[in-house]
Amino acid sequence: MSIDDLKSKIPDFAKDVRLNLSSMASNETLTPQQKYGLFVACGIASRNADVRKALVAEAAGKVDASVIQAAKAAASIMGMNNVYYRFVHLASNKDYRTMPARLRMNVISNPGVDKVDFELWSLAVSAINGCGMCIDAHEDVLRKANVTAEAIQAAVRFASIIQSAAIALEAADTE
C-alpha cells in the first residue's frame, strides 16, 4: 500500500485530508530522512493499520532500514513517555514532578540516526498523543539545535495530517 492507495480510501467527506496528504508527500521543508521518519513514527502513533501500512511502505523504498527502525523506536518510546509525563504534568499533586521516572529511555540518547531527526519524530508523536510537557521538551531541544520554526511546524503539520487520515478512515467505517 502507498500514499496514493491510502488517499483512494479517504472518503469524499474528508477531501481536505486527501489534499493534505498530497501536500505532505511533496513537502520540501524537511530532509527525506526527516520526512519519511515522520511518516513511520506518526503512522504508527495513529494506531490505524491502513495508515501505518501505507506510510511504512512509502518510507521503505526511500530511506535506509535504520531510519525506519529508529522511527519505530521514537513512536514506541513516546507511547510510554507521553502517558507518563502527561500524568506528571496534569496531576494536581506536584510531588510526582520530583520523583524519578524509573523508565528506561536509552534509545533517546542513542537512536541510531541523527538525534535531531529522532527529536523531530518524538515531537510529532508527542503532539499526536497530547503531551504538553514532552512537546515543550522536544521543541526546546530542536530550537537549541538550530532547527527552524518552519521545520518544527512542518513536523507537527505532518502529525496532524496523518492523524486526520486515521480519523477519516475510522469515520468512513461507520457508514
UniProtKB/Swiss-Prot annotation:
Disulfide linkage: C131-C134
Keyword field contains Disulfide bond: yes
SUPFAM superfamilies assigned to the protein according to its UniProt record, in alphabetical order: AhpD-like
Signal peptide: none
One of the GO BP terms on file: response to oxidative stress
Protein family (similarity comment): Belongs to the AhpD family.
Residues spanning the membrane: none
Protein purpose: Antioxidant protein with alkyl hydroperoxidase activity. Required for the reduction of the AhpC active site cysteine residues and for the regeneration of the AhpC enzyme activity.
Source organism of the structure: Brucella canis (strain ATCC 23365 / NCTC 10854 / RM-666)
Catalytic activity: N(6)-[(R)-dihydrolipoyl]-L-lysyl-[lipoyl-carrier protein] + a hydroperoxide = N(6)-[(R)-lipoyl]-L-lysyl-[lipoyl-carrier protein] + an alcohol + H2O
InterPro entries linked to this entry: AhpD, AhpD-like, AhpD_core, CMD-like
Name of this chain's protein: Alkyl hydroperoxide reductase AhpD
Pfam families, alphabetized: CMD
EC number of this enzyme: 1.11.1.28
Active-site residue numbers: C131, C134
Keyword Transmembrane: no
Record's keyword terms, sorted: Antioxidant, Disulfide bond, Oxidoreductase, Peroxidase, Redox-active center
GO molecular function, one term: alkyl hydroperoxide reductase activity
